[in-house]
């Protein structure tokens, strides 16, 4: 370089890869809020011009089949963990003398407890679940021995045996027995996987709080500074802004959707078939997943990011992708408008019915008549025409979670550049788009609504977004 400043050379030139099933939303400015009369009189959506950055957004709501992939990964990870713990109890010495000589629980031992010959030397496609989704060592309690153990990672090269008749040995049966509901809880005597065990851990950094408080002296309730035993002032450190599920009273989010919402949301109504079949039956595989809380949706986003980054890691690619996340309220409205200015609906027209009398979305058009539009409940995620950005069902079908906390005055106090009001103490989260059980007012792109973050509904789903990195004009 002849002593000249040339900068660090990257191994590969970066290019933004469009995630499968997403559309590129180019970003730009638009008039956010109600352009028509606010017939409800909420006065919480005044018009203003804002700008959002480009991003990728799922073309459809996340479907049952897509969400099942997340559920199955968590299920497999927990199962491998239980099998590994039982293998350690059976053979506490940490090695398997009969490796390769038979099919028994010993082959599911933690990779760190196997000899180099036994352990899978390749990087697993996915790391493990909960505290097991890191390759670093950590301490935990073996549920079978109630003793502290040191764990690094699971061996994902071994295929789990689900056929009860093919379980290889008694320890394997004992481990699997803990994963299924008891006989007393089994309807018709059929024991199924205990969905209460399906929990996922993910760690986030509260960047906004860190930017404002990092290094600031902590104070008590009276405003007096706090000191340690040596008389030094206690300041906020990085660990204070790490949101770690499973610690500090924060539970691991449950993963399995709440299927009882189909019964609980509607009193004196027969919806048992939806409760029994909607998430389970293959007929509904391409329908939007519902019964998912805001926390569960965020957990899915974290897992989806992890899945892609683990794939790149397996390819020995040092690059990581921007994280998947829920859209902000402004991003959602900008995407729903499809580039159309002052539009009332995503398709641009002033009505939810076409000039030929065809309904343009799945909603409740007439009092008491849910099916006049052709669907009583939800429809497949790729139903009706997409808007000009290629997004389906941005109005109707299911309402969608956003990352934004609900505040009546957020439009007045928020920034005009990538506006978003986040408040982790505010459990009311914005939902947008209206659903199959809503009237046309909630389908309008400027209508705001909210639901509590820990509440699951039969009419709320979600879709994810990913930031676009670089100049979109290149």
Label each PLM-derived region with a short phrase:
Residues 1-21, 87-128, 132, 137-140, ...:
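Sec-dependent signal peptide cleavage junction
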Residues 2, 24-25, 29-31, 36, ...:
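Functional-site microenvironments in short loops/helix caps that host divalent-cation chemistry
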Residues 10-12, 45, 448-453:
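Short, P/G- and charge-enriched loop/turn segments at secondary-structure junctions
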Residues 13-46:
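Post-signal-peptide N-terminal segment of Sec-exported extracytoplasmic proteins
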Residues 55, 62, 71-80, 304-314, ...:
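Short capping motifs at secondary-structure boundaries
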Residues 60, 64-68, 295-299, 330, ...:
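A structural signal for well-ordered alpha-helical segments within the folded catalytic domains
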Residues 419-423, 449-456:
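Short proline/glycine-enriched turn/loop segments at secondary-structure junctions
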Residues 458-474:
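Short, structured beta-strand segments at or near domain termini in extracellular proteins/domains
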């Amino acid at each position: 370089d002849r002593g000249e400043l040339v900068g660090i050379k990257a191994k590969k030139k970066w290019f933004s890869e469009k995630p499968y099933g997403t559309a590129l939303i180019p970003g730009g400015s638009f008039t956010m809020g109600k352009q028509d009369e606010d017939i409800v009189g909420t006065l919480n959506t005044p018009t203003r011009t804002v700008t959002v950055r480009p991003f990728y957004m799922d073309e459809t709501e996340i479907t049952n089949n897509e969400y099942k992939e997340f559920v199955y990964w968590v299920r497999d990870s927990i199962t491998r963990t239980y099998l590994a713990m039982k293998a350690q109890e059976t053979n506490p010495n940490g090695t398997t003398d009969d490796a390769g000589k038979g099919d028994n629980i010993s082959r599911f031992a933690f990779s760190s407890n196997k000899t180099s010959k036994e352990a899978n030397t390749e990087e697993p496609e996915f790391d493990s679940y909960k505290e097991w989704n890191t390759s670093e060592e950590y301490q935990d309690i073996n549920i079978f021995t109630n003793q502290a153990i040191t764990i690094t990672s699971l061996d994902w090269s071994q295929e789990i045996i689900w056929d009860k008749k093919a379980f290889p040995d008694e320890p394997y049966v004992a481990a699997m027995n803990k994963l299924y509901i008891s006989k007393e809880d089994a309807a018709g005597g059929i024991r199924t996987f205990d969905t209460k065990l399906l929990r996922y851990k993910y760690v986030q950094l509260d960047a906004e709080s860190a930017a404002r408080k990092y290094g600031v002296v902590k104070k008590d309730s009276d405003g007096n500074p706090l000191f340690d035993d040596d008389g030094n002032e206690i300041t906020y450190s990085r660990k204070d802004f790490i949101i770690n599920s499973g610690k500090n009273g924060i539970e691991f989010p449950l993963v399995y959707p709440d299927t009882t919402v189909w019964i609980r949301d509607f009193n004196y109504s027969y919806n048992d078939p939806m409760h029994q079949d909607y998430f389970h039956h293959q007929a509904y595989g391409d329908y939007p997943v519902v019964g998912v809380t805001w926390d569960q949706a965020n957990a899915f986003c974290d897992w989806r990011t992890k899945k892609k980054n683990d794939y790149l890691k397996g390819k020995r690619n040092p690059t990581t992708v921007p994280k998947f996340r829920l859209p902000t309220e402004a991003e959602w409205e900008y995407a729903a408008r499809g580039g159309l200015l002052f539009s009332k609906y995503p398709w641009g027209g002033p009505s939810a019915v076409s000039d030929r009398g065809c309904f343009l979305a799945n909603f409740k058009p007439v009092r008491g008549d849910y099916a006049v539009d052709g669907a009583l409940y939800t429809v497949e995620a790729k139903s009706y025409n997409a808007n000009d950005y290629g997004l389906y069902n941005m109005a109707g079908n299911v309402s969608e979670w956003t990352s934004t906390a609900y505040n009546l005055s957020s439009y007045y106090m928020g920034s005009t550049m990538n506006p978003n009001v986040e408040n982790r103490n505010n459990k009311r989260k914005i939902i947008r788009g209206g659903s199959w059980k809503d009237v046309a007012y909630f389908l309008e792109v400027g209508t705001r609504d909210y639901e509590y973050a820990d509440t699951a509904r039969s009419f709320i789903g979600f879709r994810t977004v990913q930031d676009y990195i670089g100049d979109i004009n290149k």
